[in-house]
Design a protein with these regions (language model features):
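NTP/phosphate- and nucleic-acid-binding module
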Residues: 1-176
């Protein structure tokens, strides 16, 4: 862990023959005799989730590795409760479809369009805490200029670049 301590990741137990006797699980030994099986139990516990959080967290929350992130890219539309909102949402839906066409780890990117009726700044902070590897913010001006704010969660670097070039290094990051 970050503090130099170890974490027991799994557990392994010898259970004897009790479960085999209760379930009637037998095998034939080398002499042809029926014997109750000796059983074991092994598993990864919920401590593993804690280990991921402790290893990949910082003061702002989780920094989820792209390989295990439920959503590798989260798109946040910057809505203003005006006539442009539907156009921004349509643009974000189109962007999501473009990103879903990209493959990383042999599968499509996992992209979420966050359409909750919450202020964009609150959504951003929520996704920073949840550890989304890449957060994309799109507002009316961005849409008109073909831009978006692309934020990497691992270093909180924000790039306000053109969409045509914004995702090549980001998808390489997701694939790393």
């Amino acid at each position: 862990m970050q503090d130099g301590k170890a974490l027991q990741a799994g557990t392994s137990h010898y259970l004897g023959t009790g479960f085999a006797e209760a379930s009637g699980i037998k095998y034939q030994d080398k002499d042809g005799n029926q014997q109750f099986a000796h059983t074991t139990s092994w598993g990864v516990s919920t401590r593993m989730i804690g280990g991921v959080i402790m290893t990949h967290g910082d003061d702002d929350g989780l920094r989820c590795p792209p390989q295990i992130a439920p959503h590798q890219i989260v798109i946040i539309p910057m809505l203003r409760d005006n006539d442009e909102d539907e156009a921004v949402l349509a643009y974000c839906r189109s962007l999501r479809l473009e990103l879903l066409a990209l493959n990383v780890f042999g599968e499509p990117l996992r992209v979420l369009l966050d359409t909750k009726a919450t202020k964009a700044s609150n959504k951003r902070w929520s996704w920073v805490k949840k550890g989304a590897p890449i957060i994309v913010e799109v507002g009316p001006r961005d849409m008109g200029e073909g831009k978006a704010a692309v934020i990497r969660r691992d270093n909180l670097y924000k790039d306000d670049g053109k969409l045509a070039t914004a995702f090549t290094p980001r998808t390489e990051f997701v694939a790393s």
